[in-house]
């Protein structure tokens, strides 16, 4: 029973790669600004999982500190990006990034 409960580095890294891949897929293929922001958040969460995984198996606190920094950075990025998306929606009545190619106003 003990061998089934142990989670190794490979499990964490696999989850991280899946999250990163989903985030990159969302950023590269979608045109909706909100979905793109969600993809960026998935990429940042994948980086957090990597930092915490290597921190756990290395024994240092550097990964935790980097992870906290990324969380703060993600919160600031989300606030600024959502403000920009709201202004784009008010101006152009859409959040489609392909239709917003010029910012004349």
Swiss-Prot record:
It is a multi-pass membrane protein. Its EC number is 7.1.1.-. It comes from the Bacteria. It is an enzyme of class 7 (translocase). NDH-1 shuttles electrons from NADH, via FMN and iron-sulfur (Fe-S) centers, to quinones in the respiratory chain. The immediate electron acceptor for the enzyme in this species is believed to be a menaquinone. Couples the redox reaction to proton translocation (for every two electrons transferred, four hydrogen ions are translocated across the cytoplasmic membrane), and thus conserves the redox energy in a proton gradient. Belongs to the complex I subunit 4L family. This is NADH-quinone oxidoreductase subunit K. It comes from Chlorobaculum parvum (strain DSM 263 / NCIMB 8327) (Chlorobium vibrioforme subsp. thiosulfatophilum). The gene is nuoK.
């Amino acid at each position: 029973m003990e061998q089934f409960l142990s989670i190794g580095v490979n499990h964490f890294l696999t989850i991280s790669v899946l999250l990163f891949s989903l985030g990159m897929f969302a950023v590269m293929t979608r045109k909706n600004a909100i979905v793109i922001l969600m993809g960026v958040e998935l990429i940042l969460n994948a980086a957090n999982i990597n930092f915490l995984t290597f921190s756990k198996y290395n024994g240092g606190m550097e990964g935790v500190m980097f992870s906290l920094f990324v969380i703060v950075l993600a919160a600031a990025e989300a606030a600024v990006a959502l403000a920009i998306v709201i202004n784009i929606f008010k101006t152009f009545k859409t959040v489609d990034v392909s239709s917003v190619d010029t910012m004349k106003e």
